[in-house]
Structure formats: structure tokens, C-alpha cells
């Protein structure tokens, strides 16, 4: 009887340990995810990197539809409704296999934090509150990010101001910031967010820093978001901007509208102001086909310079093979105003692309 009892306890103990191990796995998770996007593109009046040109270009480009990237995200249940969360994400140029950033391993995200019913607090490198408005309301749904005026200008990914504003790690854009603390709270249909990025400059804590706040609403087929942020460069010059947007489902069609404005001190006596208007939507043409249309208007005002800007129209036709794989064709046209593109380049530009994007 003793022998039999001992023999039963061994498998029972093994099953108990296995159950505990499974419970531990159920309380934490790590997910590998990513997007692979590559396409063939022809541009007239545009370089392969989408800048103004006097010539035409042909290229295989990465991220025409959706930016190619891979990343890790995870969470651990700490009990009492509290979770630890993290996100590491790196951009990749699929046409060459090179990292999107020459200086950062995880250029798109590198943060860790806590999440509960009151919201989440994360620390590290992450998107600004202006960028969050674009991801929620942009007419293209953040497609063609390197060519999208909402991403590049309204949300400062490519602000062309010639200085690093906020701890972005770059003088060309401030879509994401280093050394930041971010709070996001969701309460029923409403959300709020606040973010501060430390400049970490000796002798002056405000130089190279950034602060921002935002709010949003989402219910049924309606989404609205508004954010304000301010940045400083290493010399203490300021950049202040706001961005708002809204989208609505009308039947099976989606309409979206955005407007953003920012003003930057480029010297002690000079300023640059950019205003960006976006309008567009998504029209299903069948169970597997979507037509996405967007038009953007950019106006730039600079001290002691002629006002300039451009109008840009973009169209995507997408065919969904599955939830994770789709093919796309893209067409765009840009009309520059008052030499925005550079005096030696064409006054208008156009492009056509075709490619495949797969998410995992």
C-alpha cells in the first residue's frame, strides 16, 4: 500500500509541476511580429528617395505601402490587474536588407512599462502624441509613410528644419523620441495621453526636451483625436505644433479629415510655419479589394522667404489574398508651389508603384 501510494504521488507531483509551468506561461507572453513590404516604383520628377528631381527614376523600394519592420512585444501578469509590458521594434529596408537606421538597433520602439485599469506608463523610445493622431486618423492609414505629408510634416517625421528638436536622435525628424515617459489612459470611449522626453543637457534641463498632451474618442465607426506638443533644440529654440483628425464609417466607406500646424524658431530672428490639410477615405470594391484615396495640401511660411508648399494626391488599390498578405498598386501626383522642391527641378512630379506586403 505504501509503495502504491508513493507511485501515485510521483505522477501527481509531475502533473502539478506541469500545471504550474503552464500557468506561468499563461501569465506572460512574448510575440515576434513584423511587416515585409517591397515594390517596384517609377517616378518622374522624383528621386528614388522621393525628393524633387529633374529626371525620372526606377527602383525596387521597401515600405511603399507599409513600413517594413520586425519587433518583439510582451507582457507579464503581475496580479491584481497589473501587467508589465515592453516593445522593441526595428525598421528594415527590404530592398537591401539593411537596417533603416544606421545608429539605432531598435529605431522604431524601445520601451518598457506598467499597464492596469488606469492606463499605461512606458519609458524609453516611443512615438510622440502628434504621431499617435496620424496612426488613428490619417486618410491613408499611415500608408507610404516616407511620402505621406501627415507623417513627414504634420507629425514631424521629416520636418526639414535643420536641427534636432526634442531628443529624437536626428536632425531631420521628431516622430519618435528617446528618454521619454508616456502615459496613455483609456476610459470607455475616451482616451488621454501625456508625454515628456528629457533633453538630458547639462546645465539646462529644458534644452532638447519635449512635452505633449492629447485626447481621443472612438465609438462604433467614429474616431477623433487631437494633440499638442512642444519641443526645444539644443540651443533652446522652440517648436510648437498641434494635429487633429477625425474619421467616420458611412456604410462600408470610410472618410477621414486631418489638419495640423507647427511653428519653429529656426534662429533668434527667424521662424518657419507649416500647415497640413489631409482628406480622403477608403472605398471597398469587393470582398477582397479596397480603394484608398487621399489628398494633402501643405503650406509653408518662412521669415524673409516666399511662401511655398505643395499639393499631393495618392491612390492605392489593394487586393487581399488573406488577412496577412495583400498586393497593391499605387499612383501619386505632386504639384510644387513657388519652388518648394528646388529651383532646378520639375514643377510637378508623379509616380506609380506595385508591390506585395506580408504581415507576420
Predicted regions and their residues:
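Cleavable N-terminal export/targeting peptides
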Residues: 1-29
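Outer membrane beta-barrel
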Residues: 28-42, 58-199, 207-209, 216-223
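Transmembrane beta-barrel strands of outer-membrane/channel proteins
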Residues: 36-42, 88-90, 125, 194-198, ...
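Gram-negative outer-membrane beta-barrel proteins
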Residues: 40-48, 92-98, 129-133, 200-204, ...
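Outer-membrane beta-barrel architecture
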Residues: 71-73, 111-113, 182-184, 214-216, ...
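Repeated loop/turn-to-beta-strand initiation elements of outer-membrane beta-barrel proteins
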Residues: 82, 118-122, 189-194, 221-226, ...
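Detector for outer-membrane/organellar transmembrane beta-barrel domains
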Residues: 206-314
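Outer-membrane beta-barrel "beta-signal"
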Residues: 319-321, 347-360
Amino acid at each position: 500500500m505504501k509503495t502504491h501510494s508513493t507511485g501515485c504521488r510521483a505522477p501527481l507531483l509531475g502533473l502539478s509541476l506541469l500545471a504550474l509551468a503552464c500557468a506561468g506561461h499563461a501569465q506572460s507572453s512574448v510575440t515576434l511580429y513584423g511587416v515585409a513590404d517591397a515594390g517596384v516604383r517609377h517616378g518622374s520628377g522624383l528621386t528614388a528617395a522621393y525628393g524633387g528631381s529633374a529626371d525620372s527614376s526606377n527602383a525596387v523600394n521597401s515600405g511603399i505601402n507599409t513600413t517594413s519592420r520586425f519587433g518583439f512585444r510582451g507582457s507579464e501578469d503581475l496580479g491584481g490587474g497589473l501587467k508589465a509590458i515592453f516593445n522593441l521594434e526595428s525598421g528594415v529596408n527590404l530592398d537591401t536588407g539593411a537596417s533603416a537606421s544606421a545608429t539605432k538597433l531598435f529605431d522604431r520602439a524601445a520601451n518598457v512599462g506598467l499597464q492596469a485599469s488606469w492606463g499605461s506608463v512606458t519609458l524609453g523610445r516611443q512615438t510622440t502624441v502628434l504621431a499617435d493622431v496620424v496612426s488613428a486618423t490619417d486618410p491613408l492609414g499611415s500608408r507610404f509613410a516616407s511620402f505621406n505629408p501627415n507623417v513627414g510634416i504634420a507629425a514631424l517625421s521629416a520636418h526639414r528644419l535643420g536641427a534636432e528638436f526634442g531628443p529624437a536622435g536626428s536632425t531631420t525628424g521628431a516622430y519618435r523620441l528617446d528618454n521619454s515617459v508616456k502615459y496613455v489612459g483609456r476610459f470607455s470611449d475616451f482616451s488621454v495621453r501625456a508625454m515628456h522626453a528629457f533633453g538630458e543637457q547639462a546645465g539646462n534641463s529644458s534644452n532638447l526636451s519635449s512635452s505633449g498632451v492629447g485626447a481621443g474618442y472612438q465609438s462604433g465607426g467614429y474616431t477623433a483625436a487631437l494633440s499638442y506638443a512642444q519641443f526645444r533644440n539644443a540651443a533652446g529654440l522652440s517648436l510648437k505644433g498641434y494635429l487633429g483628425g477625425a474619421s467616420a464609417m458611412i456604410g462600408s466607406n470610410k472618410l477621414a479629415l486631418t489638419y495640423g500646424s507647427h511653428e519653429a524658431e529656426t534662429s533668434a530672428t527667424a521662424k518657419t510655419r507649416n500647415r497640413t490639410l489631409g482628406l480622403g477615405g477608403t472605398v471597398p470594391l469587393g470582398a477582397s479589394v479596397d480603394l484608398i484615396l487621399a489628398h494633402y495640401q501643405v503650406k509653408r511660411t518662412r521669415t524673409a522667404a516666399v511662401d511655398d508648399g505643395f499639393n499631393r494626391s495618392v491612390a492605392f488599390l489593394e487586393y487581399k489574398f488573406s488577412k496577412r498578405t495583400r498586393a497593391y498598386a499605387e499612383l501619386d501626383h505632386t504639384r510644387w508651389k513657388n519652388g518648394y522642391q528646388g529651383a532646378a527641378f520639375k514643377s510637378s512630379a508623379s509616380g506609380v508603384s506595385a508591390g506585395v506586403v506580408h504581415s507576420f
